[in-house]
Amino acid sequence: MDQVQFDFDSKSSCSTQTRHSANIFNKTNNMIYNNQLGTPPALPSPDYDYRMDYFHYKPVSGDVRDESADMVEAEYVDCDLKPKLSVDVNTFGGNQQFISPIELGEYKKFTPNTNPYNFLLVDDNFINLKILERVLLKLYPNCTIVKTQDSTKIMALLHSQTFDVAFLDIEMPGLTGIELAKMIRMEDKLNQVGIIAVTTKSLPCDKIIYEQAGIDHTFAKPLNYSFDHIITCIEKVLRAKI
C-alpha cells in the first residue's frame, strides 16, 4: 500500500510531508469545526494553500490507524476560489470536518467529458478508491466505475467486461501494479485497455520501469494536479487506444 503522511505547521498554514505519526488535528484546530455546532473554520489568511494529501489522506494519532475506520465520507464542496475536498471523520470526538483544497496552483476550468467510459480502479486502500472514484465522476459524469482492493481479481474482471482505462496502485499485496500491467500487455485482446499508475513511487527511474511494463501514464500521489491536467492526461491515454 502506498502511504503518505503529512504534518502541519499551524503558523504558516502549510503541510509538509513527514514519515512519523503525529496527531495532525492538534496542530490544525483552527481548520476543524464541529458539524453539529455549525462553527465555521477560522482561516488564518485568504490566500492559504494547504498541500493536503487528499488522495491518500488519513488522520493519524500515535500508531498508524485503519483508514476505513477513521474516514466515513469524502465529497466535493463548492468554493468561490478552488474546489475543495470535505473529509468527515468520527474518531476525534463528534462528527468533525476538515476542509482542504483538492489542487495546488490556480484552478483552471474544465469541460467534463460525457462519454460513457468504463474505468477499473484497483488500490488496496479503500479511501484512495473512494476519492479517485469521485474525481473521475467529476471529470466523466457518465462513466461506469468498477473498483476493487484485491489485485488478484483484476484479470478476471478484465476478461468479464470491457474497460477503457485501468487505474493501478503500484505497491499492493497479491499482485503489484507492475505485475498487473505486464499480465495485461501479454494478452492481445487487452491491448485496447489504457493503464494509468497512481502511486507515490513516481521518480523518473520509476516511470521508466512502468513504461517498460506497459503503463501509459503515471499520476503521482498526492494527486496535486488541476482537474484540467488530470482530464487532459486521461484523454491522451484514451485517444492512443482508439
Swiss-Prot record:
The keyword Cytoplasm does not apply. Required for stress adaptation, morphogenesis and virulence. Keywords: Phosphoprotein. GO terms for biological process: filamentous growth of a population of unicellular organisms in response to biotic stimulus; phosphorelay signal transduction system; positive regulation of filamentous growth of a population of unicellular organisms in response to biotic stimulus. Residues 118-236 form the Response regulatory domain. CDD domains: REC_hyHK_CKI1_RcsC-like. The modification 4-aspartylphosphate is found at residue 169. Pfam families: Response_reg. This is Stress response regulator protein 1. The lineage of its organism: Eukaryota, Fungi, Dikarya, Ascomycota, Saccharomycotina.
